[in-house]
């Protein structure tokens, strides 16, 4: 089977980590708001998560992500970047290396 792309995602059920959802439901009942750490970048953001701060691991450290209503339906990993762009090298430095 080939790549189905974004079209197929509309028909698939969203993946939500049960442990994470259980913690959020418990915090919603008590009215508590504390940072929840998770390594699960593939977890889909649901309406229950709105208003919570979830620290998502990016491979080096946990990045706190405050969940807003516009984020519902996206993945947690989309808001925790894994790569840092340090810029392109200067042309003068490149010319010196060639000599």
Curated annotation (Swiss-Prot):
GO biological process assignments: ribosomal small subunit assembly; translation
Keywords assigned by UniProt, alphabetized: Ribonucleoprotein, Ribosomal protein, RNA-binding, rRNA-binding
One family name in Pfam for this protein: Ribosomal_S19
InterPro entries according to UniProt: Ribosomal_uS19 (IPR002222), Ribosomal_uS19_bac-type (IPR005732), Ribosomal_uS19_CS (IPR020934), Ribosomal_uS19_SF (IPR023575)
One Gene Ontology MF term: structural constituent of ribosome
UniProt xrefs under SUPFAM superfamilies: Ribosomal protein S19
Entry GO terms, CC: cytoplasm; small ribosomal subunit
Ranges that cross the membrane: none
Family according to the record: Belongs to the universal ribosomal protein uS19 family.
Function, as annotated: Protein S19 forms a complex with S13 that binds strongly to the 16S ribosomal RNA.
Protein name as it appears in the record: Small ribosomal subunit protein uS19
Protein source organism: Persephonella marina (strain DSM 14350 / EX-H1)
Gene name in the database record: rpsS
């Amino acid at each position: 089977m080939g790549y189905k792309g974004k079209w197929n995602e509309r028909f698939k059920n969203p993946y939500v980590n049960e442990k994470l959802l259980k913690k959020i439901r418990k915090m919603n009942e008590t009215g508590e708001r504390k940072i929840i750490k998770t390594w699960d970048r593939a977890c889909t953001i649901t309406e229950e998560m709105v208003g919570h701060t979830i620290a998502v691991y990016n491979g080096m450290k946990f990045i706190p992500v405050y969940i807003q209503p516009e984020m519902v339906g996206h993945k947690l990993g989309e808001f925790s970047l894994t790569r840092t762009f340090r810029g392109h090298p200067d042309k003068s430095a490149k010319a010196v290396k060639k000599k």
